[in-house]
Regions:
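Conserved N-terminal beta-strand and adjoining loop/helix that marks the start
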Residues: 1-22, 27-58
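Residue-level marker of positions within ordered structural domains that often coincide
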Residues: 14, 44, 94, 135, ...
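A structural signal for short, well-ordered beta-strand segments and their strand-loop junctions
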Residues: 22-23, 86, 97, 101, ...
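The catalytic Nudix box helix
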Residues: 39-41, 47-106, 130
Length: 208
C-alpha cells in the first residue's frame, strides 16, 4: 500500500511563560489511530492544489518539501501540503490562519518533520509536519472548538506532557521540535527536518 500524502501542524502559543502546543483527541470512530492525542492534520486533497494564498512558503521550506518526497514533487504539490494543513486546522479546531483566512500567508510556516507510516498498517500516510506560532498567524488561542474529527482540544505544555495518551509519532515529533527550540527558540525556516520511517524492519529517526 503506497502511503497517502498528508500534512499536520504544530501550532505553538508563546503568550505565556511556558510554550504550549495545540493537540486534540481523535474520535473512537477512526480506523487509524483512534482515541489518541495528535496535532491537527489530515490527507492532502486534490483541491488543495488550487486553494488561494497571499504569500508563499519561504524558498528554504519549498526546497526541503520537494526534497522530502519519495517521487518528484513540484512547487504546487509542496505548497498544497501546507494549504492542506491549514484547511485541516480550520476544519478540526475552528481556527482561521492569518488576517485573510481565505488567502493565508504561508510564509511563517516551517517544515519540521516527515513521518511515513510503516508497512502493514491499516492506513499508511506520508505526513509532513509544519510549525507556526499563534502570534505570527493572528490566532487567538481561546477560540478553539472541538469537532467530530478532533475532540478535547487543549493547549499542552511542550515540556510537561507525559501523562497524555499521545500517538507515539506525535510525541516523537514534539520531543524533537522542543529540542530544536533550545538552540533556536524562533525555529528559523532553515531549521533541521526530522524524518521517521522504517527500513528493512528497523525504525529510522534521522534527518532530511
Amino acid at each position: 500500500m503506497r502511503p497517502k500524502d498528508a500534512a499536520s501542524i504544530l501550532l505553538l502559543d508563546r503568550s505565556t511563560d511556558r510554550t504550549r502546543v495545540l493537540v486534540g483527541k481523535r474520535s473512537s470512530a477512526h480506523v487509524f489511530m483512534p482515541d489518541v492525542y495528535v496535532f491537527p492534520g489530515g490527507r492532502r486533497d486534490a483541491d488543495d492544489r488550487t486553494l488561494p494564498f497571499a504569500r508563499d512558503l519561504s524558498p528554504a521550506v519549498l526546497d526541503k518539501l520537494m526534497r522530502a518526497s519519495s517521487r518528484q514533487m513540484t512547487q504546487t504539490s509542496a505548497r498544497a501540503l501546507a494549504l492542506a494543513a491549514l484547511r485541516e486546522l480550520h476544519e478540526e479546531t475552528g481556527l482561521r490562519f492569518g488576517a485573510d483566512p481565505d488567502r493565508p500567508d504561508l510564509s511563517p510556516l516551517r517544515f519540521v518533520a516527515r513521518a511515513i507510516t510503516p508497512p502493514g498498517r491499516v492506513r499508511r500516510f506520508d505526513t509532513r509536519f509544519f510549525c507556526c506560532f499563534t502570534d505570527e498567524a493572528g490566532i487567538d488561542p481561546n477560540e478553539i472548538r472541538d469537532s467530530d474529527e478532533l475532540q478535547n482540544l487543549e493547549w499542552l505544555d511542550i515540556q510537561n506532557n507525559s501523562s497524555l495518551n499521545m500517538a507515539p509519532i506525535t510525541r516523537m515529533v514534539l520531543e524533537d521540535v522542543t529540542k530544536f527550540m533550545i538552540g533556536d527558540p524562533s525555529l528559523q525556516s532553515e531549521s533541521p527536518v526530522r524524518q521517521y520511517f522504517e527500513r528493512r524492519g528497523n525504525f529510522i529517526r534521522g534527518f532530511l
